[in-house]
Each structure stands twice: as C-alpha cells, then as structure tokens.
Amino acid sequence: VYKRQVEYGLKPFTTDGKEISESDLVRQKKMDNKFGGGVFSLNYTNHRLTASLGGGINQYRGNNFGKVTWVKNYIGALSPAHEYYRNQSKKTDGNIYLKASYDLTGGLSAYADLQYRHIDYTIDGANDKYDWNKSALRLLAVDKKFDFFNPKVGLNWNINSNHRVYASFSVAQK
C-alpha cells in the first residue's frame, strides 16, 4: 500500500527528475507496557457479624511508538529506527471497601458493601493518525481524575435450605 511520506515524518525525494511523495514502506508499531499493583483485606467474624475491610491499587504505564524500517527507493537519510510517533500513558486505579453482614434473627441478615474508587489517567504525545488540516500527527493530551462511590445495602432471608429471598439497593460506577 502506498503511503504519503509526510505522514511518517519523511520528506519527499526526487528520482529521475520526478518528486516522489508517496511510496511503499514497512512500519512497526510497538508497545512497551508495564503493570503492577497490590491488594489487601482484613477480616473479622463473630457469631452475628462478618466484616471485611480491603482495597487495592494498581498502575499501568504504556509507551506506544511506531517506526519506519524501510521505504521503497528512498533516497533521503533514513535511520534504521526512524520513529514517526510516540505517546505515553499512565493509569493509576485505587480503591478501598468495607463490607459487613449482620445476622438480625434466625434467618434474616442485613448487609452493606461500601466502595470508594479513584482513577488518575494521563496520556501525552502523538498518535499514529495524521491530521491533514494541521499538517501534523494528532496530539494526545489527557489528564483526567475520576472518583466513584459505590454503595450496596440489602437484606437476605433464608426461608429454609432450599429457598432464599433477598432485596438490595446499589449504585455502580466505573
């Protein structure tokens, strides 16, 4: 597939008196991603109450980039690792929760599950799409923070070993 060289940061070249502005080329798109995190929980139980406090945090870091490795009949200086785009992203996601179940009577119990979640998301750099109106690669500039509260409450009624009824109310966001 012929591509316009300007899309890849390459200048047109002249061969046999003719300017060549598009050509066959080979490109590589690569990612260098890292992910890590951790979780914890503390649990408590007595004869009527079961509770858990926990949470976690994780982080993703991504470097995305593209290289032009070969251009058909290209006369200009082409580095073996000519990069035509690069961007970096980072997403940090942390949460904490408290959940509990309390036995009200012989078969009726109440429960609550409360979660707070925070997300921090950034992207910076250029993507691989060329903007012909701006004569440049499209730039990415994202710096967003999100906070969510996800409550859940309800009742469980164990009628017998074969039948159970429950009612709950919850709000979920991601």
Question: PLM features: residue spans?
Answer:
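Structural signature of Gram-negative outer-membrane beta-barrels, strongest in the C-terminal barrel
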Residues: G56-N58, H82-K174
